[in-house]
Amino acid sequence: MDPNCSCATAGDSCTCANSCTCKACKCTSCKKSCCSCCPPGCAKCAQGCICKGASDKCSCCA
């Protein structure tokens, strides 16, 4: 189990390489943003963020 991922997945392995489906996912291997309103390059989004409406901004990515 990936210590940076708090979500339990099949096989005890983190499978958020393509998309994060759990709010608490902190996988370092997550290539896409865990937050739909954040750009893929924002590393902070894997630590959790709050989207502000339908805008492309969120609490951790300005």
Swiss-Prot record:
PANTHER family: METALLOTHIONEIN, METALLOTHIONEIN-1G. GO terms for molecular function: zinc ion binding. The modification N-acetylmethionine is found at M1. Monomer. InterPro entries: Metalthion_dom_sf, Metalthion_dom_sf_vert, Metalthion_vert, Metalthion_vert_metal_BS. It comes from Oryctolagus cuniculus (Rabbit). One of its GO terms (cellular component) is nucleus. Pfam families: Metallothio. A divalent metal cation 5 binds at C35, C37, C38, C51. Keywords: Acetylation, Cadmium, Copper, Metal-binding, Metal-thiolate cluster, Zinc. A divalent metal cation 1 binds at C5, C7, C22, C25. Residues 31-62 are annotated as: Alpha. Belongs to the metallothionein superfamily. Type 1 family. A divalent metal cation 7 binds at C51, C58, C60, C61. A divalent metal cation 3 binds at C16, C20, C25, C30. Transmembrane segments: none annotated. Coiled coil: none annotated. This is Metallothionein-2C. Class I metallothioneins contain 2 metal-binding domains: four divalent ions are chelated within cluster A of the alpha domain and are coordinated via cysteinyl thiolate bridges to 11 cysteine ligands. Cluster B, the corresponding region within the beta domain, can ligate three divalent ions to 9 cysteines. GO terms for biological process: cellular response to cadmium ion; cellular response to copper ion; cellular response to zinc ion; detoxification of copper ion; intracellular zinc ion homeostasis; negative regulation of growth. The lineage of its organism: Eukaryota, Metazoa, Chordata, Craniata, Vertebrata. A divalent metal cation 4 binds at C34, C35, C45, C49. Residues 1-30 are annotated as: Beta. A divalent metal cation 2 binds at C7, C14, C16, C27. Metallothioneins have a high content of cysteine residues that bind various heavy metals; these proteins are transcriptionally regulated by both heavy metals and glucocorticoids.
